[in-house]
Amino acid sequence: MRALLLLLLVSLATLLCAQETPAGEGSALSFSRSVNVPLNGVQLYDKALDAWNWTFGREPGAKLLQSKREDGTLDGFARFNFRSAMLTMREESMGTVQYKVVIRIVPGECRVLVTELVHSGNASTSLGGVHIGPISRGKDPLSRTPGLSRSNAQRLLAELQERSIQRVEALLNGFEARLRASAEP
């Protein structure tokens, strides 16, 4: 009888244990790129600053917050405009996706990290804006989205993920191409 009770207690305890979320399910969407160019740190910094001006610097609201040549750091942010193809809450979700760009330069290598992608909807509509907030890698938004059902929030997040990947990958490809082209003799 004791053995049966102990077995029941152990099986109940394993059923009640919290399950871990799959890796990457709730994590924020981010991008990184490492570009190897045969230049010293100062030359590479100048080329990276030029590549910033031709790519991320041309985005709406782009601003370089920190630019330290001696440390080889460039920190800034920019945004791109977003308009959903979904008919539900299209005007309310129309807005911007703002993101942070961190560039670290060491001799021979330039690392670019794009993080903190955050969607802000159109707050000037009669119903107020629909804000997804931080864009995650998972299927569900990180927090509940007021004004949208779960399925519509998932579709809007999927569209934001797709557009963010397209836009940021295009900017990273342009940055790398500009950096490599300007480094050639």
Could you tell me what each predicted segment is?
Residues Q19-P185:
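Ser/Thr-rich, low-complexity intrinsically disordered terminal regions
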Residues M1-L4:
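Positively charged n-region of N-terminal signal peptides that target proteins for export
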